[in-house]
């Protein structure tokens, strides 16, 4: 049985998905132990392997849609668009057509890599005075003043124009079907709605918290207005969102609530193709987004780690975790001081990534004591920054695909906070993000709000190359935890010899502001005690939670070409391959 309105080409994968959803406490064991038995590390889920194509996405239905596209001969980008559309429907609090997106693209034929910045800009009215005249000392975290132009739809269209092969309208069919006819509410979705939906406006509460409670698990959730908007985008492309009826309704809605966006700001939006930043680490070339994202912090984190013998420290020992936490603080101090829209402010990337500078920075780690306050390496510390945030709300989805032609995409899209601005427009079904709340009003700061400026972004999709060929794609939701989780997983994979799934499932830390560190309870108590003795303020997190992101990866075996896809059990991500 399938849901009414779902594409028939997805039916064969329902059985496969059901098999894949069955978790295991440990890998399958042979019936009899051989004389030279291999030791298999326990893992929660299996690695998923294939030889033609693979996907990993933030929800099983999205992964299903992406694999169907690949099996129908589509490109990795085609699969990404299909998955992105579905995720906009089935994870509405985390991402959607009202949010932003970024992607990194590997061309299997040429080995070239390019990146797409799909973040939106502030409105023409968004001067510092616009906010200060309302007696604001900072931009609100929710509401109309927190909304910048949503860039995700333009990013889908621009990615498809360059790297897609299937008709764009066909790729949005699964998303339109789920929005119009409904999809089953999961336990995780109901929990997220319950915990994050209280700040929604009345239309948002009516849809996602009917009667004051989350929809029952297993019931069908519809957003027919969003289905209509997605159909407009499928039929009309850019005009269906940025210049037509949808743009007029969204701009009028925002203006009525006191925001700075107008219909002209929607019409002026465009994505930007950029060159990714590149850093060499552990015999791989790592590619990340340039500013306005925190990708530069990812590379500086890696470069500083070179000065420390990671393998000798040992996996998840107190010395290893302490070193990683302290290096993160140094990377984030520079990030918070300098990362902004390079079209509107000077971002000294070369200096921030200079190896000699970072070697000196790495030497600041005190092996015997955690640092509570860390200053940037140059430039004064910005007000209101503390080298990270404790917010762990569900705000982002990551998705990745590799196709039979050797092309790969590492993609991420987001509403920023859970349910973004809290504003659902009932006419269009669009939930608006709140990325515009990340501008600062601080005079002279590179990220100070200004007309037509992109805000600072935490979104960090990543890709790794080995001798010019694709090694793996990787990414995770989780705000400030993205940079931290990704380096821990890279170490697990390349230093400590774990499989992709093992690397993702291994216990992680998340350093927030000051001395605060969240740590998964699977880290031994003796290590917890040692970290406390070093001055870290530990919060021990039980079980598998979204605090530590929800990482996904596709790894290419350098000898056989076999694809191994992995997905984090901490959220709803699933991987499929064929």
Question: Could you describe each region identified by the protein language model?
Answer:
Residues 273, 393-396, 457-459:
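Short, small/polar residue-rich loop motifs at catalytic or cofactor-binding pockets
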Residues 1-14:
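Bacterial N-terminal signal peptides that target proteins for export
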Residues 212, 307-414, 428:
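Internal maturation/activation junctions in enzymes
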Residues 405, 453, 486, 495-546:
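Extended C-terminal subregions enriched in glycine
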Residues 25-27:
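Bacterial signal peptide processing site
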């Amino acid at each position: 049985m399938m849901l009414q309105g779902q594409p028939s080409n997805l039916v064969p994968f329902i059985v496969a998905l059901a098999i894949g959803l069955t978790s295991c406490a440990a890998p399958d064991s042979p019936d009899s132990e051989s004389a030279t038995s291999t030791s298999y590390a326990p893992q929660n889920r299996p690695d998923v392997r294939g030889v033609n194509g693979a996907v990993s996405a933030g929800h099983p239905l999205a992964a299903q849609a992406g694999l169907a596209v690949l099996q129908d001969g589509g490109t990795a980008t085609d699969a990404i668009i299909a998955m992105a559309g579905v995720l906009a429907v089935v994870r509405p609090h985390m991402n959607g057509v009202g949010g932003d997106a970024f992607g990194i693209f590997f061309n299997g034929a040429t080995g070239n890599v390019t990146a797409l910045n799909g973040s939106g800009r502030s409105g023409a009215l968004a001067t510092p005075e616009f906010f200060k005249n309302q007696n604001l000392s900072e931009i609100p975290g929710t509401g109309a003043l927190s909304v910048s132009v949503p860039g995700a739809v333009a990013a889908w269209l621009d990615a498809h124009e360059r790297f897609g092969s299937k008709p764009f309208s066909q790729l949005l069919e699964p998303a339109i079907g789920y929005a119009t006819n409904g999809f089953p509410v999961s336990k995780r979705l109901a929990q997220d709605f319950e915990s994050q939906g209280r700040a929604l406006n009345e239309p948002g509460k009516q849809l996602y918290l009917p009667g004051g409670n989350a929809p029952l698990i297993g019931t069908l959730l519809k957003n027919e207005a969003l289905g209509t908007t997605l159909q407009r985008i499928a039929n009309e492309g850019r005009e269906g969102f940025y210049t037509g009826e949808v743009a007029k309704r969204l701009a009028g809605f925002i203006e009525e609530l006191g925001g700075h966006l107008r219909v002209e700001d929607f019409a002026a939006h465009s994505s930007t193709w950029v060159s990714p930043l590149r850093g060499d680490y552990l015999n791989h070339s790592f590619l990340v987004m340039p500013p306005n994202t925190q990708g530069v912090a990812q590379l500086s984190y890696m470069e500083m780690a070179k000065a420390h013998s990671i393998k000798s420290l040992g996996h998840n020992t107190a010395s290893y975790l302490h070193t990683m936490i302290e290096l993160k603080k140094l990377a984030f101090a520079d990030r918070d001081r300098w990362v902004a829209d390079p079209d509107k402010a000077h971002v000294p990337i070369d200096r921030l990534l200079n190896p000699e500078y970072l070697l000196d920075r790495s030497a600041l780690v005190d092996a015997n004591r955690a640092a509570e306050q860390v200053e940037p390496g140059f430039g004064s510390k910005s007000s209101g920054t503390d080298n990270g945030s404790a917010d762990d709300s569900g705000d982002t989805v990551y998705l990745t695909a590799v196709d039979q032609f050797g092309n790969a995409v590492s993609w991420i899209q987001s509403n920023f906070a859970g349910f973004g601005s809290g504003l659902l427009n009932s006419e269009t079904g669009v939930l608006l993000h709140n990325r515009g709340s990340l501008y600062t009003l601080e005079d002279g700061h590179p990220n100070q709000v200004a007309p037509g400026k992109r805000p600072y972004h935490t979104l960090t999709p990543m890709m790794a190359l080995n001798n010019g060929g694709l090694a793996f794609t990787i990414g995770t939701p989780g705000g400030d935890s993205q940079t931290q989780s990704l380096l821990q997983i890279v170490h697990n994979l390349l230093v400590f010899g774990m499989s992709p799934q093992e690397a993702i499932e291994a216990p992680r830390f998340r350093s927030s502001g000051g001395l605060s560190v969240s740590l998964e309870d699977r880290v031994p108590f003796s290590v917890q005690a040692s970290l406390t003795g070093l001055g870290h303020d530990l919060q021990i997190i039980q079980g598998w939670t979204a605090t530590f992101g929800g990482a996904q990866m596709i790894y290419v075996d350098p000898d056989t070409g076999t694809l191994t896809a992995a997905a984090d059990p901490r959220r709803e991500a699933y991987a499929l391959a064929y």
